[in-house]
């Protein structure tokens, strides 16, 4: 699977293939026990998606370790998690522009929005950041360990453009880019788009 010259796109391609191989993988980081009754199962089914933010972070940690265990990256750099920061995971090494992944854990049965993606198109000018969406469910639908159902990796640039093209519909709905806040400390910089509906 090695490629002769590691470039930004080459590293993203190799990492994307490894991420795709996570489909069917069960993360041994948390176990939700089997409900003791039918009522307990109904109640659990209503709240199980609340685990998505926690599992999203655990998946991010595990993804960095998983990618760093792959031989193809040896000698070129290491994957690092950025928290807080954008994107979630970056490849620190000899390759420019820096490759990265914004990792989204998506719970398909959620009763609220999961895997939100509001990042500005400004982040994707070099097309070096990709979005990795990992769809997960507990291995027994509402209980068990988190299991990755499937993985989708796409250019962050194409996702942001498609989102903005879909929603931006003046004068009814406007997608607004964030203000220039580079002079602020990192934790106060605005990076997300906003929607304005009239």
Please tell me what each predicted stretch does.
Residues 91-100:
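Active-site beta-strand-loop-beta-strand hairpin of nuclease catalytic cores
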Residues 86-90:
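Structured, beta-strand-rich domain cores
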Residues 1-85, 99, 105-198:
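Nucleic-acid endonuclease domains
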């Amino acid at each position: 699977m090695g490629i002769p010259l590691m470039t930004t796109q080459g590293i993203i391609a190799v990492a994307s293939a490894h991420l795709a191989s996570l489909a069917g993988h069960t993360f041994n980081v948390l176990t939700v026990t089997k409900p003791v009754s039918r009522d307990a199962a109904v109640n659990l089914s209503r709240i199980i998606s609340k685990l998505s933010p926690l599992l999203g972070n655990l998946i991010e940690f595990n993804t960095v370790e998983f990618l760093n265990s792959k031989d193809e990256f040896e000698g070129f750099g290491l994957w690092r998690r950025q928290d807080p920061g954008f994107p979630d995971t970056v490849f620190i090494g000899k390759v420019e522009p820096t490759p990265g992944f914004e990792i989204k854990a998506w719970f398909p049965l959620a009763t609220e929005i999961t895997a939100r993606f509001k990042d500005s198109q400004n982040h994707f000018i070099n097309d070096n950041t990709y979005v990795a969406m990992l769809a997960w469910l507990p291995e027994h639908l509402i209980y068990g360990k988190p299991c990755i159902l499937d993985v989708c990796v796409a250019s962050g640039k194409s996702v942001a453009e498609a989102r903005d093209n879909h929603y931006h519909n003046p004068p009814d709905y406007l997608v607004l880019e964030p203000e220039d806040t580079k002079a602020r400390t990192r934790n106060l910089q605005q990076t997300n788009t906003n929607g304005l509906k009239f």
